[in-house]
Amino acid sequence: MKRIEPNIIKTSYYTLVSANEGVGRTFWCKRQIAKVLRTTSDRIIVFDVTGEYADFVLDHDRIVPGRIPMILHQYKITDDKPVAAHTIEVDMAMGKQPQLIVHDVSRTMTYTWHKGVLAITASLIHYLAGREHTKTWLFLNLDPYSFEDESESSWTVLERVVKQHGQEVKPVFTSRKLGVKEINRRLNIKS
């Protein structure tokens, strides 16, 4: 693991596998997710571009005791399009909604950033439809400002998700370029 500046790390995929491990943003995000899961019934959706959050689904009884319905989607590239390679459900009774949804797009993003963001965000928009009065925490460990041109698809689709669902979606960004306050200001979200 190589530290490149405060609160930012580069590491191999699937090496930070505990809620009590990690450096900077990764460690902070895992603690925040566990805190929400322990104290509320709010839903959490995580875009995981680093492959570091699967443990919340696979080992959640240790991290967050109790029967909390969780689901993990891991994606791969097929015919130049991202598709779900694996879906892992934990404590998901028939008709029950997951409290934590992790979209592991780490391998997809190594091939195509734009198509990955568009495909995964489309599934997020579908999930949020009809749930306007359900508070959802949206953890994005990806940077919507990775491309300076705001007309880029990665920016447009993320902006649409946040603005369409207003205050019912609480975004938690882990941007390398901009802080949470600055991103929220650009998206017209009151911190």
Positions of the model-derived regions?
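Switch/coupling segment of Walker-type NTPase motor domains
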Residues: K2-L16, R31-S123
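Conserved P-loop NTPase motor cores
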Residues: V17-V23, W28-Q32, Y111-S191
